[in-house]
């Protein structure tokens, strides 16, 4: 088992304390064993759907899906994949809002295992620490790469950054298209879902909150 970084342990503990962690069991299974079992069961599913897995187009599909689940679209379930985080002392005494907008994300609806496609905007007010800008994108991606509900994902990103920055002054908003709405059920191809999580000064001070939302337009 890969040892978890201090950042990963801190973030996981903070989410568990707040009841915001993705529902998971404590069962420990190696990556290779996961792939083997997923491939086996995916083969059974596809055969039950009367697909011919001897066809050269489908032959490797169970293997591809297993690899995709473990190494890519659900890799955020494993905190060994939590990004390496660089947080540095705020020697420049920056005290104005830092906002990263248009962060693309692709996640998976945990109810139907179909795509959530969206963009996030994340902001914080620097206090004692600042974070490398690309790390914000990587944190968003980490929490997107697991079965999700958008409301929880928004809160997870907020708490992760609050924990790493040791400051409540963080804001997150996500606009996303849910393919469980677009491609099935109601079949609404144009609707989007917006979720927001605000902390500290963003929640307390209307002017700061307004500045955050104004910058998204």
From Swiss-Prot:
For whether the record's keyword set contains Zinc, the answer is yes
Q: What Gene3D superfamilies does the record tag this protein with? A: 1.10.286.10, 3.30.1130.10
Keywords for this protein: GTP-binding, Hydrolase, Metal-binding, Nucleotide-binding, One-carbon metabolism, Zinc
Task: Using the UniProt record, name the top-level EC class of this enzyme in a single word.
Answer: hydrolase
One GO CC term on file: cytoplasm
Task: Write down the species.
Answer: Photobacterium profundum (strain SS9)
Which reactions are catalysed by this chain? GTP + H2O = 7,8-dihydroneopterin 3'-triphosphate + formate + H(+)
UniProt-listed Enzyme Commission number(s): 3.5.4.16
How this chain assembles, per its entry, is:
Toroid-shaped homodecamer, composed of two pentamers of five dimers.
Q: What is this protein called?
A: GTP cyclohydrolase 1
User: According to its UniProt record, which protein family does this protein belong to?
Assistant: Belongs to the GTP cyclohydrolase I family.
**UniProt pathway annotation:** Cofactor biosynthesis; 7,8-dihydroneopterin triphosphate biosynthesis; 7,8-dihydroneopterin triphosphate from GTP: step 1/1
Instruction: State any GO BP term from the record.
Output: one-carbon metabolic process
Q: Which residues bind Zn(2+)?
A: 109, 112, 180
Which molecular-function annotations from GO does this UniProt entry contain?
A: GTP binding; GTP cyclohydrolase I activity; zinc ion binding
